[in-house]
């Protein structure tokens, strides 16, 4: 009767060893090896009696990389039977994949921080926010207007700022707005607009969906995002207009928005009506020829629509810029972080659709102190390239004078052009004397609409004296 008592513990030990080993084998080779023979179990049990430490450690080492992937099975009863060593291994292994996502978390603050550039603006030291890449330009464009209007102020030593801080300042501005109308209905409508604006406020950090209409510089399809501009009293402009001198394009585009026009082009292409097919081709040609999303007609209408010294947001090519009008000319705020240390580069002129522009300081004086790294846009300090930039600028002013009605507006354009030209040559006289000075026939020369290539050739032959 003593043998059954000694033999009974052996099967119990074999069964526990079988359970542990079957679980480890199940993790390695699947459920096919789950059933075991009794003889094999006895052999395993004997092995478990001889080397109990080796029975538990090797399976934990073999399953080290497989211990974390099946955490869903941890609720099953055999899970806790693995002992303490698998728990230690699981803690070590599970901590490894948690360390991997930390690298993008370290990079996120770099994208979330924006450098603050301090400029003299109307006699007061004022901050503007710059961006290094395609950041949240709608948020920066709006906030820069609020900074230039002194509605939001920063500590004098502020050098960097986060998008969360900007959103907080903007939210406070929206909540501080009071309705001008006292009627109950208008107040409820105003409160609804504020609620809508606060809802879409986080979208400013990623981008806004706006849909332009080609009928006017301030025509956009209404979206909840537009309520932010309305509440803050910030005009939103674009310059993508159809030339009224092209009746075919006017008929093809009509009063449609951009999205509606794209749908129309697709529909007309598959139409059996030849007139619709032709109209679709005309509309498609309009989009292709105006891919810069700014036309000369739109530029003229934009100049006429903006008021003097008005701060607004200009939308073009999915980018939002801070814009102002000074002495009848349009300027865009330079927010490129590459110009962070360039104190004389604050504004960029907007006088043509080709992207040629010249930089100005905070007082809208032509800038000549650009760094070498910015030679692609500003001339890089080369006198010949700077003369070419100034010449293009003066030609654009005369073109604008030709398209606008004769009057005080045209005269102010000429006066500003002559002033800029005089400042340019006065600064160059300190380096080299100007041999010849001739009266500038601005009323005739610049209105001929010369191509860009001819203007470049002309600037090379007349590097000392530029005639328009």
Curated annotation (Swiss-Prot):
Ranges of Low complexity composition bias in the record: 43-54, 423-432
A single BP term in Gene Ontology: proteolysis
Active site: 137, 319
Any one GO molecular-function label of the UniProt entry: K48-linked polyubiquitin modification-dependent protein binding
Polar residues: compositionally biased ranges: 1-19
Protein's UniProt keywords contain rRNA-binding: no
Official protein name in the record: Ubiquitin carboxyl-terminal hydrolase MINDY-1
Lineage summary: Eukaryota, Metazoa, Chordata, Craniata, Vertebrata
